[in-house]
UniProtKB/Swiss-Prot annotation:
InterPro entries: UDG_fam1, Ura-DNA_Glyclase_AS, Uracil-DNA_glycosylase-like, Uracil-DNA_glycosylase-like_sf. One of its GO terms (cellular component) is cytoplasm. Gene3D superfamilies: Uracil-DNA glycosylase-like domain (3.40.470.10). This is Uracil-DNA glycosylase. The keyword Amino-acid biosynthesis does not apply. One of its GO terms (molecular function) is uracil DNA N-glycosylase activity. The lineage of its organism: Bacteria, Bacillati, Bacillota, Bacilli, Bacillales. It catalyses: Hydrolyzes single-stranded DNA or mismatched double-stranded DNA and polynucleotides, releasing free uracil. The keyword Lipoprotein does not apply. SMART domains: UDG, UreE_C. It comes from Anoxybacillus flavithermus (strain DSM 21510 / WK1).
């Protein structure tokens, strides 16, 4: 798995791959992928890092663990592969985006366009068993993704951290540099979206901050395929 990181994340995370927790995690994953259906595909596990090099990170949207239905997860938080129905949380994200910036709701939930503009779509756990949410929680991924968050926190350029829901907000302790901008709201899930996710306007707030700090705003519109 080490050779998967081909960009500037590789030297930054090199030490993590040698640590005892990761060696143990890798053994666990080998067995899981061999004996069960695990999402995403093995070659998609690190896509958040692959599509958004460290130097390019301007925004972080933290998710929990990958979608656990067939053909959904592909390594970017909240995103689904083209041709797959929009999960309810993602539909709510698009509804808020429509209210916030007037973007139309697209016919797909493939968020690669965001990743390529510097939006790090990071789950805190990078794998899951089919049909079993949180099944790979506590197996070691949290150490790895905490390190990713710490590395982004070390960036000199201000970064926007979008933390939806309690699970993501628990990572706030890792964001210690005051020049970063933290946006918090309830999770976009149907269970909590009406409690303050709708109307929170994270996309316009992010773009206003990026422009204030001299960077290009994000083009949030995901186009129809």
């Amino acid at each position: 798995m080490m050779s998967i990181l081909k960009n500037d994340w590789a030297p930054l995370l090199q030490e993590e791959f040698q640590k005892p927790y990761y060696v143990k995690l890798r053994q666990f994953l080998k067995e899981e992928y061999r004996t069960k259906t695990i999402y995403p595909d093995m070659h998609d596990i690190f896509n958040a890092l692959h599509y958004t090099p460290y130097a390019n990170v301007k925004v972080v949207i933290l998710g929990q663990d990958p979608y656990h239905g067939p053909n959904q997860a592909h390594g970017l938080s909240f995103s689904v592969k083209p041709g797959v129905a929009l999960p309810p949380s993602l539909l709510n994200i698009f509804k808020e985006l429509q209210d916030d910036l007037g973007c139309y709701i697209p016919n797909n939930g493939y968020l690669l366009k965001w990743a390529k503009q510097g939006v790090l779509l990071l789950n805190t756990v990078l794998t899951v068993r089919r049909g079993e949410a949180n099944s790979h929680k506590g197996k070691g991924w949290e150490y790895f993704t905490d390190r990713v968050i710490e590395l982004v926190n070390e960036k000199r350029e201000p970064v926007v951290f979008i933390l939806w829901g309690r699970h993501a907000q628990a990572k706030k302790a890792l964001i210690t540099n005051e020049h970063h901008y933290i946006i918090e709201a309830p999770h976009p899930s149907p269970f909590s979206a009406a409690r303050g996710f709708f109307g929170s306007r994270p996309f316009s707030k992010t773009n206003a901050f990026l422009q204030q700090t001299g960077r290009e705003p994000i083009d949030w519109q995901i186009e129809n395929i």
